[in-house]
Amino acid sequence: MLSTFVQGFFLSAAMILPLGPQNAFVMQQGSRRQFHLMSATLCAISDGFLIGVGVFGGSALLSQSTLLLQFVTWGGVAFLFWYGWGALRVVLFANVELAQVNNSVKNRWRVVAIIFAVTWLNPHVYLDTIVVLGSIGGQLSSDLRPWFTFGAASASVSWFFSLSLLAAWFSPVLSKPLSQRIINGFICIIMWYIAWQLAKQGLLISD
């Protein structure tokens, strides 16, 4: 059981560690100390739920549904381009945009909406949690699947809270206007690069 837990933990960690929309948003909220723990919690809960769905039968369904993959992929492309544009505006028009961003992210429900968007409109999340982890965990016996799921979900919890708290710890430096411009420039590049990759994948799916 312990070995299955450890297997789930490290496989999940390998999926989560590469910087993507979820990690970028949690880091950004941590640098501003605005709902950063809530952001980490919701990301971890979402990942845990999707991992469970994949391990207990959802992997085959998503793999076979071309229409669902198309919907998630192009929805993700549109959102990532929009989010990247918002980050670029902070870089180009720092004073005005930072003031607007600071006001908008103080709205709890707006933050919740963005968290769900970077999670549920990100096809990589589905591929990592449901398809990859789900297919591996789904091959285990019924008594070991909960341990694999618990281990994988624990990695998600550990990572998102560590990232959030670390960013909050360095908030005095990261919250400065120059730092925010650098962070947002980095986020813009990440979002648009992922959107470009997803668009290429979407065209392949349509074929």
From Swiss-Prot:
One family name in Pfam for this protein: LysE
Species of the source: Photorhabdus laumondii subsp. laumondii (strain DSM 15139 / CIP 105565 / TT01) (Photorhabdus luminescens subsp. laumondii)
Domain of life, source organism: Bacteria
Protein name: Arginine exporter protein ArgO
Signal sequence annotation: none
Annotated NCBIfam families: PRK09304.1
Keywords: Amino-acid transport, Cell inner membrane, Cell membrane, Membrane, Transmembrane, Transmembrane helix, Transport
Function: Involved in the export of arginine. Important to control the intracellular level of arginine and the correct balance between arginine and lysine.
Localization, UniProt: Cell inner membrane
Catalytic reaction equation(s): L-arginine(in) = L-arginine(out)
GO molecular function: L-arginine transmembrane transporter activity
InterPro entries: Arg_export_ArgO_enterobac (IPR023445), LeuE-type (IPR001123)
Gene: argO
GO cellular component: plasma membrane
